[in-house]
Amino acid sequence: MSVRVVVCGALGRMGRRIIELALQDKDVEVVGGVEHPDCVPSIDLGEALGKEELKGKPLTSRLEELLPYTDVVIEFSGNPTAAVGHAELTTLEKKAIVIGTTGFTKQEIEQIKEFSKNAPVLLSPNMSLGVNLLFKLAEIAAKVLKDKNFDAEIMEIHHRFKKDAPSGTAMKLAEILSETLEKKNLVFGRKGEAPRKEDEIGVMALRGGDVVGDHTVYFLGFGERIELTHRATSRDTFAKGAVEAAKWIKGKEPGFYTMFDVLGL
């Protein structure tokens, strides 16, 4: 039986790619899309996206209208406040949700975790296989290099239109390094005339052009350095991961999941 999905942020860059790949998957059915009220035209999802196979599928600003007909909500609205609201609505109806929106506060993440007591929730700042492998490799390297006099730094680059900085992926990397290295002092950008402190982890964000997403973790020692880099050249890597996550989470028990669970990492 196919997985019925609703995509929040259906007309955005990621939403469009998720829908495109979902249409190519025989195990997935797109039942509708959700957008901000200012972005919802008076036409259906098929007309909005130019997809004949989606003609008659609803496009609305009210997720609750579509929940009775869906198994999994894929949340890529790009708006953390809206995403929290969508997570609450979805889990109250005992439906699963996959969240790829980034930029959440710690309090918002705790809210989402609380919602997962009612229904399965998967939250990941990046759903590509490569980035999740980068998360794991960074953790392994940090464990080996801890107390070996190596400094850890993170740099990320994205297109000029990305709203949050640093990216959710960079912040996840920072979280992994901070916990593994037991260094809690995150420094966002550098300026001034002070030397680097031993307990720091630097996080740098660059914005420009059409860069889909580059992330590098640096382990900087004396006489050598290690660089772990992931470069995304297509949003399809993220979109494919979101579709696979939706297929995986259907029927799961209530709880809080990540892409590590999907990928078995």
From Swiss-Prot:
- Active-site positions on this chain: H158 (proton donor/acceptor), K162 (proton donor)
Q: Which reaction does it catalyse?
A: (S)-2,3,4,5-tetrahydrodipicolinate + NAD(+) + H2O = (2S,4S)-4-hydroxy-2,3,4,5-tetrahydrodipicolinate + NADH + H(+); (S)-2,3,4,5-tetrahydrodipicolinate + NADP(+) + H2O = (2S,4S)-4-hydroxy-2,3,4,5-tetrahydrodipicolinate + NADPH + H(+)
Q: Name one GO cellular component term.
A: cytosol
List ligand-binding residues for NAD(+).
Answer: G9, A10, L11, G12, R13, M14, G100, T101, T102, S124, P125, N126, M127
Q: Which GO terms describe its molecular function?
A: 4-hydroxy-tetrahydrodipicolinate reductase; NAD binding; NADP binding; oxidoreductase activity, acting on CH or CH2 groups, NAD or NADP as acceptor
Residues spanning the signal sequence: none
Principal EC category: oxidoreductase
Magnesium keyword on record: no
Enzyme Commission (EC) number = 1.17.1.8
Regarding protein family, the annotation reads: Belongs to the DapB family.
Function statement: Catalyzes the conversion of 4-hydroxy-tetrahydrodipicolinate (HTPA) to tetrahydrodipicolinate.
**Under which name does UniProt file this protein?**
4-hydroxy-tetrahydrodipicolinate reductase
Organism equals Aquifex aeolicus (strain VF5)
